[in-house]
Amino acid sequence: MENPIKNNLIIELHVPDLSVVKSFYSKLGFEISMDDKPNNKELGYLTITRKDKLGNTMLNFYGGDERVYGQSFFKQFSKDTRRGYATEITITTSSIDELYKLAFTQLKQYIVRELKELKDHGHVWKDFRMVDPFGFYLRFTELIDWGQK
């Protein structure tokens, strides 16, 4: 599959500690694009980008301290609620083997399914799964046909 996915979807993940985000995701090749630190008036906002020949992956994080738990919608849930329940964040890469080696070397404890080849609906690809320090479920995968044109 060679057609990259082109869309304008913005993923924003609410977290209480942006330094944990920086440490974890930088080990997977993400770089900081924007870093607005929390202050007395406002929570912080962090944008990270992972460059790949298939296209860049951008993730956005909001929060940075305990005030994130007071967000208008999410405040109805306990602080201990696992982040991202029933959601999979899928990140395509042209270099799945190299990325897996990086993850295995630096973040092995977060891998919840090792790299393996899968077959489904006529597609064959490799992927692996991780859970980040906040509980967001991440799938790193080779590009397959999701209907992109």
Regions found by a protein language model. Give the residues of each.
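Short alpha-helical segments used as structural interaction elements across diverse proteins
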Residues: 19, 123-126, 136
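Vicinal oxygen chelate
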Residues: 1-10, 31-94, 100-131, 142-149
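Conserved active-site tyrosine of GNAT-family acetyltransferases
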Residues: 21-26, 103, 132-135
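Helix N-cap motif at beta-to-alpha junctions
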Residues: 17-19, 94-97
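Long, hydrophobic N-terminal alpha-helical segment
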Residues: 7, 11-23, 27-29
